[in-house]
Each structure stands twice: as structure tokens, then as C-alpha cells.
Amino acid sequence: MTWFIDRRLNGKNKSTVNRQRFLRRYKSQIKQSISEAINKRSVTDVDSGESVSIPTDDISEPMFHQGRGGLRHRVHPGNDHFVQNDRIERPQGGGGGSGSGQGQAGQDGEGQDEFVFQISKDEYLDLLFEDLALPNLKKNQHRQLNEYKTHRAGYTANGVPANISVVRSLQNSLARRTAMTAGKRRELNELEVTLKTVENSEPAQLLEEERLRKEIAELRAKIERVPFIDTFDLRYKNYEKRAEPSSQAVMFCLMDVSGSMDQATKDMAKRFYILLYLFLSRTYKNVDVVYIRHHTQAKEVDEHEFFYSQETGGTIVSSALKLMDEVVKERYDPAQWNIYAAQASDGDNWADDSPLCHEILAKKILPVVRYYSYIEITRRAHQTLWREYEHLQTMFDNFAMQHIRDQDDIYPVFRELFHKQSSTSNA
């Protein structure tokens, strides 16, 4: 009996190629499931893996089967209700496994549950931020951040079966077999020459011939025992991520924490900023992020205080814009930096302050930033701040506005704001 022993060091990844093929084939269904799942997560659990469910009908594959029509005879096991030529009625209220689960139970019908599988954190984030990029990113300076791309990098002794290099593995196999059998082959050739000489000598030396033949057989057996291929020979194509030059950038995150922002509205703003942070940290290595919280006064804070501080107060949006302008002038020269900003608010602002916000943005901020996005989170009618910003949208191409009403709008709005443009200006 022949036994196959799997001695691969990376045996746990034997199905990686099949998994990658499955993710490519059903990417649209998986992305749809992810976009629905992101809104159901807690604020602190956005970057873990995810259980993805796909309707069984969506993963059906083509198959060969007999065509309809014609006469065929079949034997179905367990049949005690029908005889030949009976017509089988369609089940009442037909079943299916992909229903919502709402309704009354019934005795008829059958179906299949949705196909559910787990994707890793990396797979989840890759699909979550696919086709997204910072708009209008330009290479306008010598100091640069790093954007990573995958490149071939020689060969490695470990890898997945999909990356195996057949030619390099066979070359190693030939070299190993040559090195391990070279001495034995020389000895074998010498014994064969000696045997031929003994066979032609007179008188016959039968015992010597028998000894030589035995040694030759043992050497040939040793040579044949050297395996044709061994795990030591296997080589896999290696890939590594290399830093690609890309202009350095800074993202300003401006969040309204005034008393008009209730906890649900703040949670939606935090979800948006967490998505933004994950996108920046995963796509670019050295993007600076400046966090600004504001009510009647604006304050630059660290990441922890930005997301978890309970401080609140009245609403003067211009305080955050003034602070951003000061920070830009002090630390981020527009000639050296690509400057971005994302502002989240419920739109509630002191009426006399909204025209001032318009003026600061139009004269000081929008002329120096690559892209400025304003997200208003409210179910109410838009107020003066939104109307002032609408005038800016008609004047500046680098200004974008979006409206979030509930959690289901967060991810679509995020993708709309940061989708990768077909014709970028970062050449």
C-alpha cells in the first residue's frame, strides 16, 4: 500500500488558493454583505474580521445535466406515494432557505440556508477600502510618505501551493540528487568496469563475479532510494511590499461636540472618523492626523481624547476653522504638504457665526487644501451652516458635502467622499 505523507511546513494554508479564488469570484456579494455588516458593529470593533453570508442561489455553479423533455425512468428511494405516470404536485407555499425568518411555520417546502463563512481582518479591510484614495494627492515635494505596492522578490522556501515555482524546484531537485549520488555513481562505474574485466578473465572467477554483482545491486538500490523531489527542493515565488513614493499628507478631523450633538449623533460621527483613520493607516504609512474637537472653543487633542472625551458646551463652528488655519500656518506649509480636512457636525450653529465660517473657508482654508469634506449628521431640516456651505460647493471643486441621517448612510457616504477618481492629478 502507498502512503502519502504531507510534510509541507505551511500545511495550514493548503486551501489558500481556493479561498482567494472564491473571494475574487463572489467579490460583489461579499462587499454587499460587508457594507451591511459595518453599520451593525460597535464603534470599537470596526477593524476585526467578519462573518459573511451569501445567498445560496448566488454561489450556484454551472453543471451538466439531462435536458428537459424526452422519456426517462428513474427510481427514487423511499417512495411510497406515487406509481408510474403520476404527476408530482408543486409544494404549497414553496420553501426556501433564504427567507427573512418572519411568518408562520408550515409543513411543506424545503430549501437551503445562506452560505456563511469567516473572512480575516486583512481580507475585511482590503474589501472595505477597495478603490478608495485621497483625492487630488500630488507629488509636490521631496519629503514623502510611503504607499506600499506588491512586487516580486526572488524565491522563498515557504509559501502557498499557488506560488510554487516548478522550474526552480526541479533545478534544486536535480542539484540535490546529483550531489547525493555522485560518489555512488563513480563507485558504480568502477565496479561495472571491474566486473567486465573479471568476466573476460581466465580461468573464471565465479565468487568474485557474484560479489561484484551484489555490490552493484546494492549501489543501484541506494541511488534509487534518493527521492526525485523533496520538500527541501521546493521553492515558492516570493512577494514583498515595497514603499512607493507618494506625497506627504495631513488630515484634519474636526468634530462638533456641542450640547446639540446627542450620544447617537456623536457615535455616528465617531464611526465615520474611525473608518477614515483605518483607511489612512492601512493605505498610507506616514499620514499626519490632526484631531480638533470644538463647542464654543476649539482644542487640538490626541486620538484618545478625540474619541472618548465627554467635554461639551455651546456651538461656535468658526473656532475649529480658526484653529485649523493656525495649525496649517505653524506646521504644514501648503507647498510641502497635501492638506485634507473632514468636518462632522449636526449643522446646529450660532446664526451669526455661519457667515464667518463661510468667509474663513473661502479666503483661508479652501485655497490651500486639496480636499475638504463636510458631513452633516441630522434628521432635521438643514440650517444656516448647510446653506452657507452650499454656496462654497458651487465656488470650489475641492469642497464636498454629504448628509448622514442614520447609521446605514455612514459607509456609502464615506465611499462617495473618498472613491478613487478615474483621472487623478497626482502625476
Swiss-Prot record:
What top-level branch of life does the organism fall under?
Answer: Bacteria
Instruction: Write out the biased-composition intervals (Gly residues).
Output: 92-109
One Pfam family linked to the record: DUF444
Compositional bias ranges of the Basic and acidic residues kind: 78-90
InterPro entries the UniProt entry points to: UPF0229 (IPR006698)
> Where is the stretch described as Disordered?
78-110
For this chain, the family text in UniProt reads: Belongs to the UPF0229 family.
NCBIfam families in the record: PRK05325.1-2, PRK05325.1-3
The protein's name is: UPF0229 protein Ent638_1670
**Native species:** Enterobacter sp. (strain 638)
Q: Organism classification, top ranks?
A: Bacteria, Pseudomonadati, Pseudomonadota, Gammaproteobacteria, Enterobacterales
